[in-house]
UniProtKB/Swiss-Prot annotation:
The modification N6-carboxylysine is found at residue 103. Catalyzes the reversible cyclization of carbamoyl aspartate to dihydroorotate. This is Dihydroorotase. Keywords: Hydrolase, Metal-binding, Pyrimidine biosynthesis, Zinc. Zn(2+) 2 binds at residues 103, 140, 178. It is an enzyme of class 3 (hydrolase). The keyword Hydrolase applies. It comes from Yersinia pseudotuberculosis serotype O:3 (strain YPIII). Pathway: Pyrimidine metabolism; UMP biosynthesis via de novo pathway; (S)-dihydroorotate from bicarbonate: step 3/3. PROSITE patterns: DIHYDROOROTASE_2 (PS00483). It comes from the Bacteria.
Amino acid sequence: MTAQPQTLKIRRPDDWHIHLRDDEMLSTVLPYTSEVFARAIVMPNLAQPITTVASAIAYRVRILAAVPVGHKFTPLMTCYLTNSLDVKELTTGFEQGVFTAAKLYPANATTNSTHGVSDIPAIYPLFEQMQKIGMPLLIHGEVTDAAVDIFDREARFIDQILEPIRQKFPELKIVFEHITTKDAADYVLAGNRFLGATVTPQHLMFNRNHMLVGGIRPHLFCLPILKRSTHQQALRAAVASGSDRFFLGTDSAPHAKHRKESSCGCAGVFNAPAALPAYASVFEELNALQHLEAFCALNGPRFYGLPVNDDVVELVRTPFLQPEEIPLGNESVIPFLAGQTLNWSVKR
């Protein structure tokens, strides 16, 4: 029997999908990311979305001001696509190095997406320009038609929206974000070098039974919602395959405790404090630790055309106890896997 590894050294990872929020929440949650990750693709869905170069620069300044001393962290800013976004603003932001990518939220698909796009073909001129300049398109892949069941919205999005976009703009770099279904995993595997996908720790570790059987667990509620076990297993198989189309994107999305534990709770899982140990645990369960570094630190930079990080992080086989709550002023945030112990810890 092969001895279990006691340490894992990998290049410092990046998080290719995160919500850092703003103000007190930003300063509370950012250190959990900046301590471990070198870079992160920062989502633009603030209450006032990031739609201009000026607002992206201002937000980046606020993020950098919240980075603790001793942490080396680069936020990669994104532009929130709207029905009326000026193509010149998008182009200028990308060419100046302010925008790393642009984010497509179908209107009302998730938190703070009311400003999102209601008529996707109407913004095809933006996609045409993005294809021309090599700017990646990041997609929250769910249809928002009220007649479509919430568990079917990702699969329906592939046929109705994503495939037509890829047919019309074959060299547009697209990240199918936080995929949750076998349909999406198979679609990405069958794609080409212009299509990638991020996968969250919660969608690899849990399915909808974990969220709903024996009581509702609001801290597992996120969008896209957890699916049935067959979809979870397909995601696990996809990342274990070693395919370079899949890369780390936590979709860490904090909300104050009272906004999660309510009669109409918010969607989002705050997984940043345990993200890397959680991914390591999954890859070990799948006998795929040989692919962990590529998933966490190599595939994303390759897709974005960015250099990989020079330094390394070390994971050690030391039990890691996730706190029950994290203080947030007079409130708190409940982290992913609260009160649970993981097998791996990041060496500090």
